[in-house]
A protein has these predicted regions:
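Extended recognition/assembly regions associated with phosphoester-bond processing machinery
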Residues: 1-77, 82-222
Length: 222
């Protein structure tokens, strides 16, 4: 875990890690979103050559984050899996068996379509739309937050959009990087899975974005 940045929200400390996770210090929660496990297997099943190592590398990063932070609970803000069951789901179960001591909760996303019995057997608690912990709420798509009545001080964590920003370099070149995106009312986590697309943000003046560049997390100054 070479790099992290502390971001404070409502007097709570959140550690943004280059591993594309957030660790909530006060509650010992590890938060991540959009792993899209099984996506590489889904593409290979369709005849598209995608290296099997991609999913293994994502799982190694996942396990490394758990070993480093030693969370009391892991909260996945949607899209743990990409599609119906395939061989990569079986591989996940093997890793999960080694991490049975860590409670896991999934706020279901639009890609989480495997049967509920599967999650039960994997020891993963599931929530359909919104999960609350104190004054912080967790939802896959921030648009679903409109259904929850906000009280003063409430703050949302979400995923779904795979946020990114474009950074210009020399020679009028630009590169796109995944980022943590914070507004006054909600945050959007970068996709944890590396075999995912990104959505280019246009942050407002009051927003904050923290860019993930290899082994670093950097505050993006517009």
């Amino acid at each position: 875990m070479p790099s992290f940045v502390k971001h404070i929200i409502n007097k709570n400390d959140f550690i943004l890690n280059c591993n594309r996770t957030i660790f909530w210090e006060q509650e010992k929660l590890l938060i991540l979103s959009d792993l899209h496990l099984g996506k590489t297997g889904h593409f290979r099943k369709s005849g598209i050559a995608v290296p099997a190592a991609v999913m293994k590398e994502d799982m190694q990063r996942f396990v490394a984050a758990i070993q480093f932070f030693k969370p009391a609970q892991v909260v996945i803000v949607g899209d743990l899996f990409h599609s119906v069951e395939n061989k990569e789901h079986e591989l996940f179960l093997k890793w999960r068996n080694d991490l049975q001591h860590v409670p896991m909760l999934l706020v279901k996303g639009n890609h989480d379509i495997v049967p509920e019995e599967w999650y039960k057997n994997a020891g993963i608690d599931i929530v359909e739309k919104i999960w609350r912990k104190n004054n912080f709420l967790f939802v896959h798509h921030i648009e679903d937050a409109a259904e929850e009545s906000l009280s003063k001080g409430d703050y949302f964590f979400s995923g779904h959009t795979h946020p990114a920003v474009s950074i210009k370099g020399l020679g009028k070149q630009s590169l796109r990087f995944p980022c943590f995106y914070f507004t006054e009312k909600y945050a959007v986590l970068p996709a944890f899975g590396k075999f995912t697309g990104t959505y280019l943000l246009s942050p407002q003046k009051k927003d904050k974005t923290f860019v993930v560049v290899e082994d670093s997390v950097i505050l993006h100054r517009k």
